[in-house]
């Protein structure tokens, strides 16, 4: 995994951890796909999922937008998924 991918995963962790009531249960997994894109999977305590999603999905959309912007600076595609 490249430094950029690690930086984006750390960005996700720094954005998600302050949002939740159970920060010890935040898990960020990143995997480089065959096409070179990055898949980031966010796992949180089930009670915290709503906080990460936000009203009408605004929070998770904002996280996805930031990650895509960070990846596009280096010509890389980034997908962010919240796993329940």
Segments and roles (model prediction):
Residues 53-57:
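Glycine-centered tight-turn and secondary-structure capping sites
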Residues 1-49, 62-84:
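RNA-contacting regions in translation and RNA-metabolism proteins
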């Amino acid at each position: 995994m490249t430094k950029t991918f690690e930086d984006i995963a750390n960005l996700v962790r720094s954005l998600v951890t302050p949002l939740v009531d159970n920060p010890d249960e935040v898990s960020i997994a990143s995997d480089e796909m065959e096409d070179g894109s990055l898949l980031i999977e966010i796992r949180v305590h089930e009670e915290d999922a709503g906080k990460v999603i936000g009203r009408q999905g605004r929070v998770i959309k904002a996280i996805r937008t930031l990650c895509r912007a960070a990846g596009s600076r280096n010509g890389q595609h980034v997908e962010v998924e919240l796993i329940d």
